[in-house]
Amino acid sequence: MKTPRLPIAIQQAVMRRLRENLAQANLKLDRHYPEPKLVYTQRGTSAGTAWLESYEIRLNPVLLLENIDTFIAEVVPHELAHLLVWKHFGRKAPHGKEWKWMMESVLGVPARRTHQFALQSVRRNTFPYHCQCQQHQLTVRRHNRVVRGEAVYRCVHCGEPLVAG
């Protein structure tokens, strides 16, 4: 799928939110953390990722276009919080107590680990599997691991191995 072009107004809104959150964090933490690089190359069902060593935030342009206001209000500070935790505390659990504190106490945003965006436009083909209690849909990657004998996936409810079909 081709990456969509983001209107400049949306890119500016994202950058404005990033800068506001960063200024707020620098003020509350009495630091001068630099502005991270912002790119729109995230693919798949992830809304964004924070790359620590390159100090970069990658955002999903498809999900951004489909959920502009919520995306900017939630995903941008979420990913920035990962970078700020890394700068402030060192390497910590991705959604641990330091990240939660950074989100809620420093940035003033509810600490949610996952987004609730509709994924139809970014979801790839899935394969039907089942266990004793329900149907499951495995991604292409997981399905291929099962086919190659590299993985066995189990139902989180009944614990039974998932079977194709």
From Swiss-Prot:
The organism's place on the tree of life at top rank: Bacteria
Any Gene Ontology CC annotation: cytoplasm
Native organism: Salmonella typhimurium (strain LT2 / SGSC1412 / ATCC 700720)
Cofactor(s), names only, from the UniProt record: Zn(2+)
Family matches, as HAMAP family: SprT
Gene Ontology molecular function terms on file: zinc ion binding
Main location: cytoplasm
Residue sites binding Zn(2+) per the record: 78, 82
SprT-like domain span: 22-163
Gene from which this protein is expressed: sprT
Gene Ontology terms: biological process: response to stress
InterPro entries named among the record's database cross-references: SprT-like_domain (IPR006640), SprT_Zn_ribbon (IPR035240), Uncharacterised_SprT (IPR023483)
Protein name: Protein SprT
Keyword Metal-binding annotated: yes
Alphabetized UniProt keyword annotations: Cytoplasm, Metal-binding, Zinc
Family: Belongs to the SprT family.
Record text on cofactor binding: Binds 1 zinc ion.
Places the protein is found: Cytoplasm
NCBIfam families for the chain: PRK04860.1 (NF003421)
Active site, per annotation: 79
